[in-house]
Amino acid sequence: MEGFGSDFSSGSSSGKMDTGTIMEQVKVQIAVANAQELLQRMTDKCFKKCIGKPGSTLDNSEQKCIAMCMDRYMDAWNTVSRAYNSRLQRERAHI
């Protein structure tokens, strides 16, 4: 059992993961999860709004509705994200 965790307790960096690398990986994973959630919510909302009778194809009005709905959803998401990030920056400046 002596070897268990020895890479972490020893001074060598061969077995250690760099904290910065781990943080970057976590940030990427969070960004991917957020993008997946955004896409899923947008798809659900726009489908419910624009598709009255699901079929094998979308008619012209459904295609236009989906495109406009997704554009509006993304615009709203970006507006909220900018406002949220701005607020976080202001709060961090006061700390």
From Swiss-Prot:
Membrane topology field: Peripheral membrane protein
Q: List the disulfide bonds.
A: 46-69, 50-65
Its GO CC terms are: mitochondrial inner membrane; mitochondrial intermembrane space protein transporter complex
Keywords associated with the record:
Chaperone, Disulfide bond, Membrane, Metal-binding, Mitochondrion, Mitochondrion inner membrane, Protein transport, Translocation, Transport, Zinc
Q: Metal-binding: is it a keyword of this entry?
A: yes
Q: Where found, per UniProt? A: Mitochondrion inner membrane
Q: Keyword rRNA-binding, does the record have it?
A: no
Q: Which GO terms describe its molecular function?
A: metal ion binding
The protein's superkingdom reads Eukaryota
Q: Where is this motif: Twin CX3C motif?
A: 46-69
A Gene Ontology biological process term: protein insertion into mitochondrial inner membrane
User: Where does this protein have coiled-coil stretches?
Assistant: none
Q: What does this protein do?
A: Mitochondrial intermembrane chaperone that participates in the import and insertion of some multi-pass transmembrane proteins into the mitochondrial inner membrane. Also required for the transfer of beta-barrel precursors from the TOM complex to the sorting and assembly machinery (SAM complex) of the outer membrane. Acts as a chaperone-like protein that protects the hydrophobic precursors from aggregation and guide them through the mitochondrial intermembrane space.
UniProt family annotation: Belongs to the small Tim family.
Q: Domain comment, in the record's words?
A: The twin CX3C motif contains 4 conserved Cys residues that form 2 disulfide bonds in the mitochondrial intermembrane space. However, during the transit of TIMM13 from cytoplasm into mitochondrion, the Cys residues probably coordinate zinc, thereby preventing folding and allowing its transfer across mitochondrial outer membrane.
Q: How does it assemble?
A: Heterohexamer; composed of 3 copies of TIMM8 (TIMM8A or TIMM8B) and 3 copies of TIMM13, named soluble 70 kDa complex. Associates with the TIM22 complex, whose core is composed of TIMM22.
Q: What is this protein called?
A: Mitochondrial import inner membrane translocase subunit Tim13
Q: Which organism is it from?
A: Danio rerio (Zebrafish)
* Source species taxonomy: Eukaryota, Metazoa, Chordata, Craniata, Vertebrata
Corresponding gene? timm13
